[in-house]
Every structure is written in structure tokens, then in C-alpha cells.
Amino acid sequence: YLLHWRGSIPLEETVDAMEELVKKGKIRSWGVSNLDTSDMKELFSVPNGDNCQVDQVLYHLGSRGIEYDLMPWLEEHQIPIMAYCPLAQAGSLQRSLLKNKEVQKIAKARGITPMQVLLAFVFRKDQVIAIPRSGRTEHVLQNWAVKDVVLTDEEYAALDRAFPAPEHKTYLDIV
């Protein structure tokens, strides 16, 4: 079960409610969505806050703000990241990512689609789980095939140059 937004209820009350649901067998575990580093630190300061199992955040090649401090903090605390919109949703941003010469070059060299390059990028860290949306069986199978794609250091470096991670704290992107 996920707390999707911070809201007006204190985190301590939310954690108590989640833990009660676990205790009653209504849910197996719980996590959060769209909580940034300061929110996660506050969450971990309340009793049982460290029982959080995941932080679901927007993350893709064109939205790398979490890499500055949230991703390292979550990694340090062994909390997986569930990347939503790992393919940058439909629209102009996704089109620009797919048409990027480095993305195209990697896709061509590997015999995969540019979309698969975008998805493979988010798996750079073992702690990242991705939940790409797909409405066609063909795309589901292409997404599944990415489990066998491991980009090289050189490929990651090329993508880093094309779409650099921020060098300072940025607001958490949300959809």
C-alpha cells in the first residue's frame, strides 16, 4: 500500500495507521510516493517510519533530480525506488529523448528500440524498480526484454553527457 502524497495528516499518524493495517493482515507492507529527501528523513524519525518498503518517484533520463540526494539517501537506507513514468510519458519530452542521437546510437548498436534504451537507463542502480505503462502486448514484451540489457559504462557516460544529472538540489518532479 502506498501513501501517494504527503497531505495534512502528520506522518506519525499515517505510519501508525499503516502499521495497524499490517498487524491486522489487511496489507503486507507499505511505502510512499513522491516523498523527497527531507520528507524521508522526517518519516524515518517517527516510530516505525523505517518500515517503509519503497519510495515511488518520477524518474527517467530526462528527469534525474532524484540522483542529487534522494537516490543516495534511499540507497544508504536500503529503500528501493519505484520509478514511475520511466519512459517520460508520451509527448514532446519523450519524443526528444527518443530522437536524441546518443539514444539512437545505443539502440542501433544493440539492436534494441530507443524506448528500451530509456528503460535500461533507469536500471543503472540495482535499487530501482520501474513501472512502465504499456497498452500493447508488443510493448510489454519489449519492456520485459530490457531485463537482459545492461548498458556499458561508456553508454551511460554518453547518456550522462546528453542528459546530465543536476549538480544541485532540484524540486522533486511529479506528474
What are these regions (language model features)?
Residues 3-175:
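Beta/alpha (TIM)-barrel catalytic core signal, keyed to glycine-rich beta->alpha loops juxtaposed to Asp/Glu
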